[in-house]
Regions:
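N-terminal signal peptide c-region/cleavage motif recognized by signal peptidases
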Residues: 15-20
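Sequence context surrounding c-type heme c attachment/ligation sites in exported
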Residues: 22, 26-145
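Short, linear, compositionally biased motifs with a strong N-terminal bias
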Residues: 10-13
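Bacterial N-terminal signal peptides that target proteins for export
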Residues: 1-7
């Protein structure tokens, strides 16, 4: 039951990201939002496989995890500038606690990379999604409106 709740949270996040982008004027905020949307898209690939809405493909799952790792490494770079926009959901705490924000991002990058090398079967994917979702939640709880 907890797992399906976690999956629901991931899909709610993905939906909110899509609607949040309309009307954003600041280019730095747009870059951040696009990076987050791409992360959500890759998480969705994994979630769809776990929910068996799409067939399991080990290579595609590994690729999605590798992309999540790469995007996590890029995350601090797109947040260096404290840009604002009425559509931004970034809390000011990001810049007050940039080292902690960066650490959470690097932790997710490492987790995603390790998981990418270990996913062989659909049974490997469920715990992988749980770990990824926990990493996303750790950052969003603290740094996202």
């Amino acid at each position: 039951m907890k797992f399906f709740k976690l999956i629901s949270i991931v899909f709610i996040f993905i939906s909110s990201v899509v609607f949040a982008h309309s009307g954003v004027k600041d280019e730095n905020v747009k870059k951040r939002m696009m990076l987050m949307k791409t992360m959500a898209d890759n998480t969705k690939i994994i979630g769809q496989m776990v929910k068996r809405k799409t067939p399991f493909d080990a290579n595609e799952a590994r690729l999605a995890l590798e992309r999540l790792s790469s995007l996590s490494l890029e995350t601090p770079e797109v947040f260096i500038i404290n840009a604002s926009d009425p559509k931004s959901e970034a809390k000011l705490a990001i810049w007050d606690e940039f080292d902690e924000f960066t650490k959470l991002s690097m932790d997710l990058a490492e987790t995603s990379s390790v998981l990418a090398s270990s996913v062989e079967t659909i049974d490997d994917l469920r715990p992988a999604l749980k770990q990824i979702s926990s990493g996303c939640k750790a950052c969003h709880t603290k740094y996202r409106e």
